[in-house]
Amino acid sequence: HLLLTTIAAVVLVGCATMQSQEKTPKVEPPSISIHKAASIGDIEAVRQHLAAGTDPNLKYPVVNPPLLFAVGYEIMTLLVENGADVNDIGWGMTALHRFADPKSVRYLVDKVADVNAIDKFGDTPLHKMVEGYLWQQKESVEILIAAGADVNALNFDGMTPLDNFLTNHIAAPRQAKLKREFENLLRKHGAKTSEELRPLDKEKAE
């Protein structure tokens, strides 16, 4: 009797487990691709993809992973928290080249994003950052420098971040003060133009 009771209990448990599994519906990915969902800010579609097991670093049918298409902080962090590689270069840039707002930059740095990674032009995130709108980028630049960004890295054209800044910001008179303050910020951390670096390189060689 004890044996029969034990067998019956095992059978009942097995049936209950099978019924439980049958009741749990399989999550299907949405019809929209995870790359498209990330690029248009459809966070629910991105969540559905991740729940369905879509690779957060998927590069098919495009070369870039979803992270480099992400619009906004929420989708960016959702992807990273689910395994997106913050240092994936894709077709020529990393997430730090893509996101410029201080909140995103700080988050990526905390996730050990490479602050000196180069894109397809040899630009570091700092090269790209100083090309943007000055009043938005100052804090982000300071975060990158504090995290170890090379203020005198040379891109493939032999330009430093300061070269990039001076080339891209031929400021209108009303922005002259802001431009001067931003240049002073870079120089305070040792930034130089490639022209200014040449005498230093010559001295080191001698």
Residue ranges of predicted features:
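C-terminal motif of bacterial Sec signal peptides marking the signal peptidase cleavage site
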Residues: 13-14
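Bacterial N-terminal signal peptides that target proteins for export
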Residues: 1-4
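Alpha-helical protein-protein interaction modules
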Residues: 111, 140-141, 145-149, 156-163
